[in-house]
Amino acid sequence: MSRKIDLLDRRRARVRRALRAAANGRPRLSVFRSSKQIYVQVIDDASGRTLAAASSLDKDLRARLKTGADKAAALEVGKLVAERAKAAGVTKVIFDRSGYLYHGRVKALADAAREGGLEF
């Protein structure tokens, strides 16, 4: 199991290094995916602040969602974070998939955030 975690950490570091080079001052849309929930934050790395955040545990979403671990939950979280980011004055971000494959829940969240008005 530790080998899997080590490989994930290496992938995550490689993705973040590439993002830092390509960011050009844009905030980072960072995704964390657990087995039961999905979380996303818009982070300004220059100041070290979180500008907007959403997760499948938000009270607004919890009542509507059957579970936080499917694509439907990721779609709702993506829409919600886009709405909150736009309210905070952020429209252009760089997508940090945190070493996860761009497939399934991560892809659904990214597509919903794009539909919500975020550009990346």
Curated annotation (Swiss-Prot):
<keyword id="KW-0689">Ribosomal protein</keyword>
<keyword id="KW-0699">rRNA-binding</keyword>
<dbReference type="GO" id="GO:0006412">
    <property type="term" value="P:translation"/>
</dbReference>
<comment type="function">
    <text>This is one of the proteins that bind and probably mediate the attachment of the 5S RNA into the large ribosomal subunit, where it forms part of the central protuberance.</text>
</comment>
<dbReference type="GO" id="GO:0008097">
    <property type="term" value="F:5S rRNA binding"/>
</dbReference>
<keyword id="KW-0687">Ribonucleoprotein</keyword>
<dbReference type="GO" id="GO:0003735">
    <property type="term" value="F:structural constituent of ribosome"/>
</dbReference>
<dbReference type="GO" id="GO:0022625">
    <property type="term" value="C:cytosolic large ribosomal subunit"/>
</dbReference>
<protein>
    <recommendedName>
        <fullName>Large ribosomal subunit protein uL18</fullName>
    </recommendedName>
</protein>
<dbReference type="InterPro" id="IPR005484">
    <property type="entry name" value="Ribosomal_uL18_bac/euk"/>
</dbReference>
<dbReference type="InterPro" id="IPR004389">
    <property type="entry name" value="Ribosomal_uL18_bac-type"/>
</dbReference>
<comment type="subunit">
    <text>Part of the 50S ribosomal subunit; part of the 5S rRNA/L5/L18/L25 subcomplex. Contacts the 5S and 23S rRNAs.</text>
</comment>
<dbReference type="Pfam" id="PF00861">
    <property type="entry name" value="Ribosomal_L18p"/>
</dbReference>
<keyword id="KW-0694">RNA-binding</keyword>
<comment type="similarity">
    <text>Belongs to the universal ribosomal protein uL18 family.</text>
</comment>
